[in-house]
């Protein structure tokens, strides 16, 4: 009877040990399936690098059609109350990235009228004249790049980029780019920068593979921006 009890105890210990090892292996594999993708923006063209001002740059990743990501990409999360504020005859922030389908507020915090509009393909709209202290709202239904202006103050400009992916990065002031928690797999890398001609509408893109040994985008070269 004692021998049976000892054997039974050993059997349970072995099974528990196997379960623990399997859970550890699954967890390790899960953590190994994502990485942080990094890159750096550099200006090309006639200007010398020492005098070039880095243009606003955004990159994003979309899975290549037919290439499943593991784990699957989560839906992009909307920032709380995304807004493009009009203040001191400028838009704040100058570049705003939102999930497609987001509603963006355009509050006027200047002591005079503004007339915000966009004529490019991302989202066409004209909010008309509206006074200080009031707000207009625009819904960006589909992915796209919208160039925003004011019909009264030509020096005002901004960009709203609506995306269908949570994997994006806005370049820092020194040109650094970083996207965390990128699942291993094949992606299209999309690159938008202020130095690109708006009329071209489409950002640059190329296919990349993200893996444990391939997570650096290297140097992303973009043209200098015209914005002062």
Task: Describe the predicted segments one by one.
Residues 5, 14-16, 211:
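Intrinsically disordered, low-complexity peptide-like regions
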Residues 1-11:
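N-terminal secretory signal peptides that target proteins for export/translocation
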Residues 8, 28-31:
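Compositionally biased non-globular segments, especially hydrophobic aliphatic-rich helices
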Residues 30-228:
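Extracytoplasmic copper-binding redox domains, predominantly the cupredoxin/blue-copper superfamily
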Residues 15-25:
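Bacterial N-terminal signal peptides
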Residues 11-12, 112:
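A generic signature of intrinsically disordered, low-complexity regions enriched in glycine/proline
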């Amino acid at each position: 009877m004692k021998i049976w009890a000892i054997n039974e105890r050993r059997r349970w210990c072995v099974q528990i040990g196997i379960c623990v090892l399997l859970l550890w292996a699954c967890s390790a594999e899960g953590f190994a399936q994502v990485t942080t993708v990094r890159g750096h923006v550099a200006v090309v063209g006639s200007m010398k690098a020492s005098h070039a001002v880095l243009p606003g740059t955004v990159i994003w990743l979309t899975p290549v059609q037919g290439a499943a990501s593991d784990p699957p990409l989560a839906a992009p999360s909307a920032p709380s109350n995304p807004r493009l504020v009009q203040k001191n005859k400028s838009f704040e922030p100058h570049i705003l990235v939102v999930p497609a389908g987001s509603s963006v507020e355009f509050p006027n915090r200047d002591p005079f009228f503004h007339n915000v509009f966009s004529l490019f393909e991302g989202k066409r709209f004209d909010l008309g004249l509206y006074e200080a202290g009031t707000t207009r709202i625009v819904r960006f239904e589909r992915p796209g790049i919208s160039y925003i202006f004011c019909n009264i103050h030509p020096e005002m400009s901004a960009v709203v980029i609506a995306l269908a992916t949570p994997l994006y990065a806005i370049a820092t002031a020194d040109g650094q780019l970083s996207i965390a928690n990128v699942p291993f797999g094949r992606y299209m890398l999309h690159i938008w920068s202020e130095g690109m001609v708006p009329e071209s509408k489409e950002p640059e893109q190329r296919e990349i593979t993200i893996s444990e040994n391939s997570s650096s985008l290297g140097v992303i070269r973009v043209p200098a921006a015209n914005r002062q």
